[in-house]
A protein has these predicted regions:
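Catalytic-site microenvironment of enzymes
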Residues: 1-256
Length: 256
């Protein structure tokens, strides 16, 4: 009797322990069911950066004159135009590159583009201009920007002036964009309009513009044009005008 009662007691203890374990599991499951389920974090899609406004454009920047050809001469300082053209053109190059363009320069120092030997019928000036055009053609330029300074007998004349080839619709649009940004950024006393001009560099079959950045015959404007900060401002304005054109007329959209 005692042995049998001991076995029953042991069985009862085991049953109680099992029931307790089951109850604990059920309680834990119930508590867990009340917790908010966290969804797995989806993988984030990395968006590619927006292309720069002049990405894919090859732009020829031509600092006018150079070497034997000094261009106009500033009335007060006597500085030759060729030096200021180069300083501004290098700023144009920097600003164009910052906007994604591939820039080709016709010169980076004080030099002309004449050869030592040339046909007798070919003047130094003509050969210089032809070689500038040849650089644009060889590099398949999509746009040409020729940088110059103006000069006039009336010292009161001032302000930037942009020229394009007569009959070149794309060139006229480019010149208009350049003129607008130059006026907006430089706020000249006289707001000029882009004009048609007969310049050799504008005869290319791509959008081309010749930018007269200001008048070296105007003392106040001469002082500005000799200042590196103003040269950088002019360069940035020209690059912004080129970008404005590219937005209106994407590369290859129309002939000049």
């Amino acid at each position: 009797m005692g042995g049998k009662g001991g076995r029953w007691l042991a069985a009862a203890v085991i049953a109680v322990l099992l029931l307790g374990a089951v109850a604990a599991v059920l309680a834990a499951n119930k508590a867990g069911s009340g917790q908010k389920q966290v969804a797995p974090t989806p993988e984030q899609t990395v968006q590619p950066p927006e292309p720069l406004p002049l990405t894919g454009w090859v732009i020829l920047v031509d600092p006018g004159h150079g070497g034997y050809d000094g261009g106009a001469r500033a009335r007060v300082s006597g500085t030759w135009e060729k030096h200021i053209n180069l300083a501004v053109a290098l700023e144009v190059e920097k600003s164009l590159a910052a906007r994604g363009a591939s820039v080709v320069m016709t010169r980076r120092e004080d030099e002309d583009l004449c050869e030592t030997e040339r046909p007798a019928s070919l003047t130094k000036k003509r050969q210089d201009m032809e070689n500038r055009v040849a650089i644009a053609v060889a590099n398949r330029a999509d746009m040409v920007l020729s940088i110059h300074m103006n000069e006039y007998r009336d010292a009161r004349q001032s302000g930037p002036q942009v020229f394009y080839r007569q009959g070149a619709d794309a060139g006229r649009l480019l010149a208009g964009c350049l003129q607008e940004t130059l006026i907006a950024e430089l706020t000249p006393a006289r707001a000029r309009q882009a004009m048609a001009g007969d310049y050799f560099i504008l005869q290319l079959e791509v959008p081309s513009a010749l930018v007269e950045c200001g008048f070296l015959s105007n003392a106040a404007e001469e002082r500005l044009l000799l200042t590196p900060a103003y040269q950088a401002k002019v360069g940035a304005a020209i690059a912004e005008g080129a970008a404005a054109y590219a937005e209106l007329r994407p590369k290859g959209a129309a002939s000049p």
